[in-house]
Amino acid sequence: MKFRYFYSFPQSASLTAQFIVRLPPAIVCFDSLRDAPPTSEGAFRIGTNLFAKLKFEKEEVMKLKTTLLGKTYIFKDLKEVLAKANEEKTGDKLAGLAAESAQERVAAKVVLAAVLLSDLRENPAVPYEQDEVTRIIQDDVNEKVYEKIRNWTVSDLREWILSEKTSGADIRKLSRGLTSEMVAAVCKLMSNLDLIYAANKITVTAHCNTTIGLPGTLSCRLQPNHTTDDPEGITASTLEGLSFGAGDAVIGLNPVTDSPEQVGKVLRRFQEIKEHWEIPTQICVLAHVTAQMKAVRDGAPCDLIFQSIAGSEAGNAAFGFNAATIQEARDLLLHEGTAEGPNVMYFETGQGSELSSNAHHGTDQVTMEARCYGFARRFQPFLVNTVVGFIGPEYLYDARQVTRAGLEDHFMGKLTGISMGCDCCYTNHMKADQNDIENLASLLTMAGCNYFMGIPHGDDIMLNYQTTGFRETAALREITGKTAIPEFQRWLEKMGFVENGRLTAKAGDGSSLLF
């Protein structure tokens, strides 16, 4: 802890000592009383000049150093502490932000554990005046909740979250007083099992046409991507996925052609399938937000509007939108969309996206990812998922880093209070394989993840990456005793695809849904 003492002096005085710091007129700051010992009169002498005492003030300054095993580690600012407290990530190394050794990483964690939540509030990753994501995060804080916890340390927050006495409802209430930097900080002090245990406490639901995130459910986005956007190919994958029990979260396609006309064409095909078989679900085409808005204005049916988001204003600008665009899209869908709502937005994120567009502001990728969720919360989304390994080994090198990032992102999303899923995936040039992705999906199921992806054989031939297939979600439901969203589960049973919580012999036969 550091103390500062403030005293008055004549504005005409000549003060040249290095320890003197000029403040507003007539104020001088000394870092210790030794710099200007008091006289017997209670005034303070600098050279031959005598000055009367104006005020005494104690200011607590963050202690950003620690000594471990005889070596002292000093960090220049809170941003450096946050970065170096991260578990190893190649993206942070690429940005020049990572700890140089395991010892330095531990030292940063020790320092971070003692940081006050108020220090994190007052030192956002990007200044309030410069960044609308920061403004959204800060303005959305519940001040009454924050005042109760502002003097907690990050360690206090961690212990409280992990306490057996703390319920999920307790965490949801407290989360309204957290900024994204606080969320990221506590995440950095948790082990993988801590992240699973804590996230599993938290239930976050959202409603579009159905309600996702209910206890005892595990949902799946049906992702029928096609290399040429061929309607019949898309339909074939959609029907097959439905027969395996995929699609209760959303039937959502990434189009090859990002045009309003193509968006409308695919949405109409999805709506035709949904209406013919009376399927209780949501539909979406994951084009740019502006293309989807144009399609809706042209009369296309649409339940959810999608956009990839970043943790800074500059990152979102690189994606071609700002907060006003998202608000306009949400308002449009609430008035002209086909969903019940009120949750009609779908966002995707992923550690490292800000660095890829040089929009990270010298901030580590976990903290920037947490800021994505703070931004998303403003717009009350139905779905948010990290596409955890999609960006490649330059940001997450191997299966170990992908697993850690997936658990971090899921925990941070739920702690922020959003309906959180995960695209457990990897690229072909990453040191990971399908077994690693199944491991992550299994861990996230234990953590209470709301949904995964479902793609034929887990191989997205359009986006050229690997993720979970149709059978993975079905298997995880059976193992854990979970089901699809209740209305969708009843539809599966009615259609004969599921019986007693298990897939039937009819599962996988998409031809049974041809019409």
Label for each model-derived stretch:
Residues 92-107, 112-115, 176-181, 188, ...:
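Alpha/beta enzyme core
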Residues 218-224, 249-251, 281-287, 304-307, ...:
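Hydrophobic faces of well-ordered beta-strands that scaffold small-molecule active sites
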Residues 174-175, 186, 190, 250-267, ...:
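Glycine-rich, proline-tolerant flexible connector loops at the mouths of alpha/beta enzymes
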Residues 220, 262-287, 328-339, 403-420, ...:
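Alpha-helix-loop-beta-strand connector modules within alpha/beta enzyme cores
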